[in-house]
A protein has these predicted regions:
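Short, function-defining helix-loop hinge/capping sites that tune catalysis or transport
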Residues: 20, 58, 88, 98, ...
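A conserved helix-loop-beta module that forms one wall/lid of the active-site cleft
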Residues: 201-213
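Short beta-strand-loop/turn "lid" adjacent to the catalytic site in phosphate-handling enzymes
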Residues: 63-102, 130-136, 165-187, 210-213, ...
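Active-site core segments that coordinate phosphate-bearing ligands/cofactors
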Residues: 2, 8-10, 108, 115-129, ...
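Residue-level signal for inorganic ion chemistry
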Residues: 27, 50, 77, 104, ...
Length: 506
């Protein structure tokens, strides 16, 4: 008797490693396996990964998972991965150069070349994004100019999960709408490649991958993959989406005004909208959802929990190295909102939303001999929360206020951030039931829609649950209404000094 195909298997290809998870039809994680892989930094500002090592890690995870569940129960495989990458492959899917990943910023020259062809304003209206070094299009230009033989042989420009899709199914040259958007080579208004822009830049639009919705099931597991992993030949594979799009779906976001906050090494605030949300100052950005219909509007804090971790290690560690997070939270709770005047600007890796200034440095200010580690701890939490609020505030200014908020990512495990964010946002904030599984759950939802386990993304949102709800604290809210404007003023006050430091080549 054949087993019921009642499970979904997801492959999440992240920056530091991959995680493969099996979900049931209720959105519950049945089992999960992680493996790491390296990032190389061959020169300053360069960040690369070997796609083959990612595939080996994913295949290894799948083999381990299938020791715990029968492969005959897997109804579909769903994928997600880091966005903004650049993997050139030939017509056979052979990798021609390591993946130039999202954190690579070698392309200042190419960014200026794009800006010479189209104004920043027109580019933003066309693609929903700024011209910036983190995205794929400048990386394609860099390869064209510096590795002409690689460019000549390239048939497709892929992101991480697109390459993985090709290796699983034998079908290379596909991407979904979310990853396509953050190549910054897509006309997001018309949902097609920006062929005129590409032509003006001398880039062959025919080498951009074909567009699929994340739930489209056009590929199936090959016999070679069966031998490598144990997945049954012919098992459907949904291409899924970029990690940002999958996180939104895994957070249950599908209605306008319903948003989420993600706190990981970086952090962001996002919501799904029926149309792009444009800001006159281009402080927020847009990309298509993996469904190919809806849009995500997003504001990103470049250094989220990474700023918190740096502070723990370097300012709050004492003689024994990094202080326990629970102890830091207890310290921070002893201090009133506003940290009695201590303020923190968490721009330790430059800034995206709202300043978009790569030279920006972090700042900790307002302390005196009276203040101690408890004030610093409180200020760090508040600085990151204030930075996230600036993202939500811009959306409100643009006519797209968030009315409900889900918190996810590693920061959602904090006992302090949910209360703090609720009072700073002025919005009841829920914490995701499984904050570490949100992105993978989004990939599972796409796969489930693809094989009919869920009729629609909206129906699938019903499997998303929260574990706690945090109301606005009126006393905290009143205090933050006084301190947030002071926080917002820091950047402009210190910018001349920051620019002076940058002029020294530091």
């Amino acid at each position: 008797m054949a087993m019921e195909k009642d499970l979904l298997l997801t492959c999440d290809a992240g920056t530091t490693g991959c995680k493969c998870t099996v979900f049931d039809a209720r959105g519950e994680a049945v089992c999960s396996v992680r493996r790491s892989y390296p990032t190389s930094y061959p020169r300053p500002n360069w960040s690369e990964q070997d796609p083959q090592l990612i595939v080996e890690a994913v295949f290894g995870c799948i083999r381990e998972l299938l020791q715990q569940v029968s492969p005959q129960r897997i109804a579909c495989v769903g994928l997600d991965g880091t966005m903004n990458g650049c993997i050139p492959v030939d017509e056979n899917g052979t990798v021609l150069h390591p993946n130039i990943i999202h954190s690579d910023t070698r392309t200042e020259k190419q960014v200026n070349e794009i800006a010479g062809v189209i104004s920043q304003k027109d580019f933003y209206r066309l693609t929903g994004n700024r011209i910036d070094t983190h995205y794929t299009l400048p990386k394609i230009l860099w390869i064209k100019e510096n590795l002409p033989e690689v460019y000549r042989k390239t048939r497709w420009w892929l992101n991480t999960k697109d390459y993985l899709y090709g290796r699983l199914t034998g079908r290379f040259g596909y991407t979904d709408y979310s990853d396509a958007s953050l190549t910054i080579a897509l006309d997001i208004n018309n949902r097609r490649w920006a062929t005129e822009l590409l032509q003006d830049l001398g880039v062959d639009a025919q080498r951009m991958p074909r567009l699929l919705a994340g739930h489209d099931v056009k590929g199936r597991i090959t016999r070679d993959v069966y031998h490598a992993t144990g997945l049954i030949t012919g098992t459907p594979v949904a291409i899924g989406g970029g990690d940002g799009a999958c996180t939104a779906r895994g957070a249950g976001v599908y209605l306008p005004g319903s948003g989420y906050t993600y706190i990981g090494s970086s952090a962001w605030v996002s919501q799904i909208t029926p149309a792009p949300v444009f800001d006159e100052e281009a402080r927020i950005f847009n990309y298509l959802d993996m469904d190919g219909v809806s849009y995500h509007v997003c504001g990103t804090v470049q250094c989220g929990a990474a700023a918190f971790d740096w502070t723990l290690k370097n300012l709050l560690g004492g003689d024994d190295g990094m202080m326990e997070i629970s102890r830091v939270e207890n310290m921070a709770r002893q201090i009133k909102p506003g940290a009695e005047g201590v303020l923190f600007l968490p721009t330790l890796m430059g800034s995206r939303t709202p300043y978009w200034d790569a030279n920006t440095r972090g700042a900790l200010m307002g302390f005196t001999l009276y203040h101690d580690q408890r004030h610093i701890a409180r200020a760090i939490y508040e600085g990151i929360a204030f930075a996230l609020n600036s993202c939500a505030e811009i959306m409100t200014e643009c006519g797209a206020p968030i009315r409900s908020m889900m918190l996810t990512g590693g920061g959602a495990r904090s006992g302090l951030w949910p209360d703090m964010l609720a009072s700073i946002y002025g919005l009841e904030t829920r914490v995701h039931k499984s904050p570490g599984e949100t992105t993978s759950l989004g990939a599972a939802i796409a796969a489930g829609v693809g094989v009919g386990m869920f009729k629609t993304y909206e129906e699938a949102a019903g499997v998303v649950a929260s574990r706690s709800s945090h109301p606005v604290n009126p006393v905290w809210q009143e205090a933050y209404a006084k301190y947030y404007p002071l926080y917002k003023g820091i950047y402009q006050q210190i910018k001349p000094t920051i620019d002076g430091i940058a002029a020294l080549g530091l």
